[in-house]
């Protein structure tokens, strides 16, 4: 196979060092450039065919400083720690939002205030919670704090920052406290016991809080009894079904602290800019301000951080020669692949000493961009080929730490990444962000773009569009993107299914009251009904002889409900993160090495026999998928193609392949809508080999069918037969229904508290339908819960 094709270029000219500038083949110059020079260079080289369809310039914003009021008195040790650790003068150099947040947290108010800080990327939100936490824990030897981050990388990043700060506490201080991480990477019993017994600031994630800390709370008596602060960072990540689970986990934590350990932690929440910060905070932690004695939540949105000038380019890949009038069915092949284009831009960034992140929507795209970029650099600047890497989920923890460190230090100049680096990990000063397709929300796009130009530095962001309708809409209507408001973050803590799951977990941790009272404060007005259902199913048991307690709300003695399950938390996946996974084992040499892991549900998509698996730019071929040992064997292979599995997903109601009875077709439209259990089955039948550069399929391999399935709930709308018969004469109704289903999926988060990955729809394949005409497929909209 040939290397990825480059777009046509004009005649080259020589630069000062004698290298060509890229107009007649790959740019071989390695002269450093600033952002403005680089944009001009792109216009003359890679974008010479008019790929830059819009330029948006965002003006700089100066810093707004503020000082703390006299009501807040920080200790000398705290002031010295931040001054020596990160060079921050807490007396005079705080941004306005930092000062507002610290005053709200440490100020003497009744009722006490929880705080939500919503500001832009790299605005110094961590100072808002680190200052009060450090000051309080230095002053009180019994006080503890819990930091909760959505990713392990963020936890490691915050650990490094806190250790630098605490290393600068004056030697005379006797109350310097221990900091520890408690997550899945801390595997030994000894290490976990050390964190529990001695550390006073513990960094974790919602998953570990759910499956380990709360169920084993009796091992955490010291920590929970002294809990003063709970930090929820990157709260905008807690949305949809995942956010609803996190909201119930937080309520379980509050319940144990209040009812068993006599503590009442103050919540400090930080978030990127969202449309509804106060409502989101209320939904997450459960304080809605409706009771006179209830804590209130203070919103801090006066972002005082500076921002440098940012140039934002919309980049539409060039049309292939003669492709401007292609029909719709061929349109996905009419442009140069955006994967190649973004790889060329990334290579140029590295060559001209601009530090860059290239955001990709999937792991496979991330690896492909790295492969293409290295191939380009080996041709144009071979000594820089190792200056790029990829970063995504599935890598071993040690490998992730090395990449983070090398990006921060400048050893790496470019990284192709999934949204794993979207959140606020400190990777140093970046110049450029690249975005391969729309990431799913305006908020995510700005969060990613905000990684470049931290503080006053000038920055560039380039959004490279696919040929799909959404990307092309933004390419043609840029104001629809740049004038769009930030989306709302949704959490539905009253989701009855999720409430039931977490009430079982809560009953395991501490038996529930059988009647309304204390526990309704945490689980809402549906708690009584949910508890009754769990009793009827035998999941909760009433034992008045053994469990009788005083209910202070009802002022009577009441029986308690105990959980009959041994480990209910293990049965609740808070974000479909699977405990089961396949190890990817490199068997290229006699010393086998685990290089990554793949979730069990994705194994048939990624590591089937014959699959091309890429890891840090290395191409490997999967030679064996061991289902019993859950291992995928891969070995090095020099191939110029990637593979795409062939599969079909079908939706059916358990008990029969047909969802509808014969009488359904005569019902009015309003009666054709149903909601019930749905079975989702995926059958894998083979794979295609796809050429890297052209993206053309050139071979197909079949293998014995394999299948996976899961049960969930769905809603569907049957299209009446009379409409089908009339419309089918003039239009492809099945394709229209398929398109409409995806349109509904995209619009659903605007009306329902869910994320874009929380729901799926029934998809139709014209080819498969023709091949498998023996199987009845009713024409319908069908949407199902992915969880």
Please describe what each predicted stretch is.
Residues 1-100, 111-114, 177:
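Helicase-associated low-complexity/disordered flanking segments
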Residues 134-157, 175, 258-263:
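Conserved SF1/SF2 helicase motif Ia
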Residues 144-147, 151-158, 346-376:
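Conserved strand-helix element at the start of the C-terminal RecA-like helicase core
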Residues 184-228, 406:
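Conserved helix/coil segment N-terminal to the catalytic DExD/H
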Residues 236-303:
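Post-DEXD/H (motif II) to motif III coupling segment of the RecA-like Helicase ATP-binding lobe
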Residues 268-269, 465, 507, 514-604, ...:
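Extended, highly charged accessory segments
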Residues 274, 278-362, 504:
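Conserved interdomain linker/interface between the two RecA-like ATPase lobes of SF2 helicase motors
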Residues 443-492:
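Conserved segment of the helicase C-terminal RecA-like domain
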């Amino acid at each position: 196979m040939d290397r990825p094709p480059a777009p046509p270029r004009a005649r080259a000219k020589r630069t000062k060092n004698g290298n060509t500038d890229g107009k007649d083949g790959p740019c071989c110059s390695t002269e450093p450039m600033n952002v403005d020079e680089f944009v001009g260079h792109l216009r003359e080289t890679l974008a010479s065919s008019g790929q830059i369809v819009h330029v948006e310039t965002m003006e700089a914003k100066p810093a707004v400083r503020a000082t703390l009021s006299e009501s807040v008195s920080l200790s000398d040790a705290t002031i010295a720690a931040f001054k020596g650790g990160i060079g921050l003068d807490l007396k005079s150099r705080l941004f306005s939002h930092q000062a507002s947040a610290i005053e709200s947290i440490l100020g003497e108010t009744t009722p006490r205030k929880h705080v939500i800080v919503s500001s832009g990327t790299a605005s110094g939100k961590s100072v808002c919670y680190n200052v009060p936490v450090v000051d309080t824990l230095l002053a009180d030897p019994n006080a503890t704090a819990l930091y909760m981050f959505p990713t392990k990388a963020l936890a490691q990043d915050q650990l490094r920052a806190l250790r630098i700060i605490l290393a600068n506490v004056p030697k005379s201080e006797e109350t310097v406290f221990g900091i520890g991480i408690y997550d899945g990477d801390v595997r030994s019993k000894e290490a976990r016991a050390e964190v529990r017994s001695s550390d006073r600031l513990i960094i974790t994630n919602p998953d570990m809080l759910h499956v380990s800390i709360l169920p084993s709370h009796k091992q955490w008596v010291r920590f929970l009894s002294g809990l003063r602060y709970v930090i929820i960072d990157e709260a905008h990540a807690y949305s949809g079904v995942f956010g609803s689970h996190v909201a119930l986990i937080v309520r379980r934590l509050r319940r144990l602290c209040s009812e068993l350990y006599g503590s009442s932690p103050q919540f400090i929440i930080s978030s990127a800019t969202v449309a509804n910060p106060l409502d989101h905070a209320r939904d997450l932690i459960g304080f809605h301000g409706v009771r006179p004695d209830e804590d209130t939540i203070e919103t801090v949105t006066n972002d005082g951080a500076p921002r440098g000038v940012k140039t934002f380019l919309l980049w539409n890949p060039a049309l292939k020669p003669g492709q401007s009038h292609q029909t719709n069915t061929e349109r996905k092949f009419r442009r140069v692949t955006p994967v190649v284009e973004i790889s060329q831009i990334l290579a140029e960034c590295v060559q001209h000493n601009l530090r860059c992140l290239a955001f990709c929507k999937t792991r496979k795209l991330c690896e492909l961009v790295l492969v293409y970029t290295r191939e380009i650099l080996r041709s144009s600047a071979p000594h820089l080929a190792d200056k790029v890497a990829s970063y995504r989920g599935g890598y071993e923890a040690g490998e992730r730490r090395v990449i983070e460190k090398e990006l921060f230090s400048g050893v790496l100049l470019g990284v192709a990444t999934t949204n794993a680096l979207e959140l606020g990990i400190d990777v140093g000063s970046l110049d450029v962000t690249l975005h391969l397709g729309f990431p799913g929300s305006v908020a995510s796009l700005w969060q990613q773009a905000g990684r470049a130009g931290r503080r006053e530095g000038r920055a560039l962001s380039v959004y490279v569009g696919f040929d799909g309708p959404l990307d092309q809409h933004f390419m043609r209507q840029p104001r629809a993107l740049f004038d769009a408001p930030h989306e709302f973050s949704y959490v539905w803590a009253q989701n009855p299914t999720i409430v039931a799951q977490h009430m079982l977990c809560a009953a395991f941790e501490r038996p529930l009251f059988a009647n309304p009272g204390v526990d309704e404060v945490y689980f809402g007005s549906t708690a009584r009904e949910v508890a009754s259902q769990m009793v009827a199913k035998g999941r909760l048991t009433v034992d008045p002889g053994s469990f009788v307690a005083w209910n202070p709300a009802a002022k009577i003695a009441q029986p308690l409900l105990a959980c009959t399950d041994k480990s209910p938390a293990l049965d609740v996946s808070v974000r479909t993160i699977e405990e089961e996974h396949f190890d990817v084992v490199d068997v290229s040499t006699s010393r086998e090495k685990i290089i990554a892991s793949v979730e069990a549900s994705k194994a048939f998509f990624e590591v089937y026999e014959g699959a091309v698996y890429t890891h840090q730019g290395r191409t490997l071929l999967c030679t064996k998928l061991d289902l019993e040992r859950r291992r995928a064997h891969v070995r090095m292979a020099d191939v110029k193609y990637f593979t795409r599995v062939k599969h079909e997903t079908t939706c059916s109601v358990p008990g029969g392949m047909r969802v509808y009875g014969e009488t359904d077709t005569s019902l009015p439209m309003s009666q054709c809508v149903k909601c019930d259990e749905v079975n989702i089955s995926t059958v894998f039948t083979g794979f295609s080999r796809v050429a890297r550069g052209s993206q053309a399929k050139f071979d197909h391999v079949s293998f014995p069918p394999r299948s996976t399935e899961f049960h969930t709930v769905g809603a569907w709308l049957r299209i009446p037969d009379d409409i089908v018969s009339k419309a089918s004469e003039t239009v492809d109704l099945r394709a229209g229904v398929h398109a409409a289903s995806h349109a509904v999926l995209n619009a659903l988060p605007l009306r329902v508290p869910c994320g874009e990955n929380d729901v799926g729809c029934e998809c139709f394949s014209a080819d498969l339908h023709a091949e498998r005409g023996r199987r009845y497929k009713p024409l319908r909209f069908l949407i199902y819960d992915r969880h």
